[in-house]
């Protein structure tokens, strides 16, 4: 049933679908017509199905409309349906479980005093290497207790000058200290960046030898990785990032193509805030075996690598089924008939899979993909296609949150409204099983605020009003939609989120406010030109220029990017500060979703134009397996 004609205006029936299944049930809608005042007597408006590269079209109803000419969905149903995998056999899971046990034994051996893996001259670095390896290989969820034990041991030997390679090394080591600073900080330990001061010369500069050995390059590579986990005001981290970036770029000009050069290029390009875990795992699997600077037994490396490949491919078999389910959902609601809008459900799902690779988190991955897709459709309706009269009707319908409200909507809006209504209610039911309380009212409030911000922007477009920067940002933090894409899928994860915890993660916490501000500003630096061409004048860039007469567009973009950099350091602190009373793992979900959108806006507006980078991400992380 096509979305544009899914529910005729005089129909008393509504096609209901479930979020995680596709059983259809026809239910009668209340016969009472909603008292919305603006409801037009029986007039329905269906959009023209012809695409245009212009920004203004006239439909068969004679209503002038703007469309953006977005390209079509790149992932056809046949491609999704034909995805195959050979890793569903129980034998692969059995082998992976055996390897998990063997790796646990390796962790256990590290706790044996003066054992084969615990030389007092290298035990600290060995523990850090193991933790870092299982995390980057995407298998750390199996070793949470072992990781905590290893890091507790390292932290017990941490000093104001850092650490050496082992507890009896006698001298601090840049590689171990940098890796320790990064890893301990990310796990919530209190460690000061001032340990890096002890690796500067008398002039206060980081130094290196003229000959760039592989070992020294890896030292600086870990310094670079550590420098990205910076808090506000940490000048030493800024200096470390500048030095290590210059050093590594220079090294790339001198060393031959190798796993090391591939790793350097990857980390310089994606850093931390645009680095998605499964994307890094795919890269690290390719280069893991080439690092021989640390004398870890070959057998350990082989076990870790085999386990990482198996887990990557076993997860791929689950991804295949979830993608096929998502594709059916997309067709089932008639979304393909909405040709004036973007269709990026496959890309959104991929981004979710890149930050949530636990098989138990299927509801999160599918929920994020579906909500993000529906928000994108609504964005195109409010920003371009809908008339102001229609948008007021849709806004009132969302505020009412009643399926009978569709009787007052144009045909092309009916299916969109019911898709949101059905799926949010279904997701709330899934969340209630975990949270123990009804999350529908919580979700409704967030959607009301979101739609309210959308209609405000539509009014600005309609009237030609250009707000001040502060006025724009306050509204834009809500209209970006990150709160919705974060909160509702997160409630389906397997841990409880009582009100006290939610207040530290969701609105109006500083943590949530920073994420919303960062994403609005970052998105605008990549979208403002295309938005302006469609008649959407208000953006962070244009509003900043209004507040600062005479400033050039380039300088305004630079100023907004500088704001993003500063806010990102504040976000690092809010994520990792030890006194928040909220486990980092809870906040990490929202933080990782922030990274998802950071990645999407890294090169351009990757959510309007499915760039080669996004296509490659889908291919390498959810379409292809890795050879064993």
From Swiss-Prot:
Q: Name one Pfam family in it.
A: Terpene_synth
Q: Where is this motif: DDXXD motif?
A: 379-383
Q: Which residues bind Mg(2+) 2?
A: 379, 383
What InterPro entries does the record tag this protein with? Answer: Isoprenoid_synthase_dom_sf, Terpene_cyclase-like_1_C, Terpene_cyclase_plant_C1, Terpene_synth_N, Terpene_synth_N_sf, Terpene_synthase-like, Terpene_synthase_metal-bd, Terpenoid_cyclase/PrenylTrfase
* Reaction it catalyzes: (2E)-geranyl diphosphate = (1R,5R)-alpha-pinene + diphosphate
Subcellular location(s) of the protein = Plastid, Chloroplast
Q: CDD domains, alphabetically? A: Terpene_cyclase_plant_C1
Record: residues binding K(+): 539
The free-text cofactor remark is: Binds 3 Mg(2+) or Mn(2+) ions per subunit.
Q: GO molecular-function annotation terms?
A: magnesium ion binding; metal ion binding; pinene synthase activity; potassium ion binding
Cofactor(s) needed, names only, are:
Mg(2+); Mn(2+); K(+)
- Main subcellular location of this protein, as a coarse class: plastid
Give the protein's biological function: Involved in defensive oleoresin formation in conifers in response to insect attack or other injury. Involved in monoterpene (C10) olefins biosynthesis. Produces mainly (+)-alpha-pinene (97%) with a small amount of (-)-alpha-pinene (3%).
Swiss-Prot/TrEMBL domain comment? The Asp-Asp-Xaa-Xaa-Asp/Glu (DDXXD/E) motif is important for the catalytic activity, presumably through binding to Mg(2+).
Which PANTHER family does the record cross-reference, listed alphabetically? Answer: (E,E)-GERANYLLINALOOL SYNTHASE, ENT-COPALYL DIPHOSPHATE SYNTHASE, CHLOROPLASTIC
The similarity comment for this entry is: Belongs to the terpene synthase family. Tpsd subfamily.
Q: What is this protein called?
A: (+)-alpha-pinene synthase, chloroplastic
Tell me what organism the protein belongs to.
Pinus taeda (Loblolly pine)
């Amino acid at each position: 049933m096509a979305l544009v004609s899914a529910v005729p205006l005089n129909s008393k029936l509504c096609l209901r679908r479930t979020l995680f299944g596709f059983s259809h049930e026809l239910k009668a809608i209340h016969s009472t017509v909603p008292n919305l005042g603006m409801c037009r007597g029986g007039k329905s408006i269906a959009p023209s199905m012809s695409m245009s590269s212009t920004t203004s079209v006239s439909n068969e109803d004679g209503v002038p409309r703007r469309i953006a000419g977005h390209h079509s969905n790149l992932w056809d149903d046949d491609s999704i349906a034909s995805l195959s995998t050979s890793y569903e056999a129980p034998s692969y899971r059995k082998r992976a479980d055996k390897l998990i046990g063997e790796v646990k034994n390796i962790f256990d051996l590290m706790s044996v005093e003066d054992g084969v893996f615990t030389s007092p001259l290298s035990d600290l670095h060995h523990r850090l290497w193991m933790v870092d390896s299982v995390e980057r290989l995407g298998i750390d969820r199996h070793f949470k207790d072992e990781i905590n034990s290893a890091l507790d041991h390292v932290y017990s030997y941490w000093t104001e000058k850092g650490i050496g390679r082992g507890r009896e090394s006698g001298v601090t080591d840049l590689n171990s200290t940098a890796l320790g600073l990064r890893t301990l900080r990310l796990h919530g330990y209190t460690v000061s960046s001032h340990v890096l001061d002890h690796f500067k010369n008398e002039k206060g500069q980081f130094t290196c030898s003229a000959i760039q050995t592989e070992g020294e390059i890896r030292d600086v590579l870990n310094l670079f990785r550590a420098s990205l986990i910076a808090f506000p005001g940490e000048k030493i981290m800024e200096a470390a990032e500048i030095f290590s970036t210059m050093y590594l770029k220079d090294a790339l000009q001198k060393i031959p193509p190798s796993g090391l050069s591939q790793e350097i290029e990857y980390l310089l390009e994606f850093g931390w805030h645009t680095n998605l875990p499964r994307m890094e795992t795919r890269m690290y699997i390719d280069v893991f075996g080439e690092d021989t600077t640390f004398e870890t037994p070959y057998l350990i490396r082989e076990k870790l690598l085999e386990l990482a490949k198996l887990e990557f491919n076993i997860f791929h078999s689950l991804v295949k089924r979830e993608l096929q389910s998502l594709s059916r959902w997309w067709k089932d609601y008639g979304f393909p008939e909405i040709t004036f809008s973007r269709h990026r459900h496959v890309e959104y799902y991929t981004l979710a899979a890149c930050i949530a690779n636990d098989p138990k988190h299927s509801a999160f991955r599918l929920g994020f993909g579906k909500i993000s897709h529906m928000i994108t459709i609504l964005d195109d309706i409010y920003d371009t296609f809908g008339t102001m009269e229609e948008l007021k009707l849709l806004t009132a319908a969302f505020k009412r949150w009643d399926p009978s409200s569709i009787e007052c909507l144009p045909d092309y809006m009916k299916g969109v409204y019911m898709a949101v209504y059905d799926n949010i209610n279904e997701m709330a039911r899934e969340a209630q099983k975990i949270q123990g309380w009804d999350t529908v009212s919580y979700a409704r409030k967030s959607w009301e605020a979101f739609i309210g911000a959308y209609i405000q922007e539509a009014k600005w477009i309609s009237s030609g009003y250009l707000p001040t920067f502060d006025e724009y940002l306050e509204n834009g933090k809500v209209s970006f939609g990150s709160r919705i894409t974060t909160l509702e899928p997160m409630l389906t994860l397997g841990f409880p989120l009582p009100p006290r915890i939610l207040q530290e993660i969701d609105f109006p916490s500083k943590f949530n406010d920073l994420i919303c501000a960062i994403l609005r500003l970052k998105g605008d630096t990549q979208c403002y030109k295309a938005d302006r061409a469609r008649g959407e004048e208000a953006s962070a860039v244009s509003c900043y220029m209004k507040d600062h007469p005479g400033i050039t567009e380039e300088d305004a973009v630079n100023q907004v990017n500088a704001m993003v950099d500063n806010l990102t350091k504040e976000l690092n602190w809010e994520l990792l500060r030890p006194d928040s009373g909220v486990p980092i793992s809870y906040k990490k979900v929202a933080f990782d979703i922030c990274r998802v959108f950071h990645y999407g806006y890294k090169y351009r507006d990757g959510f309007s134009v499915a760039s080669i980078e996004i296509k490659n991400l889908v291919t390498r992380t959810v379409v292809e397996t890795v050879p064993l």
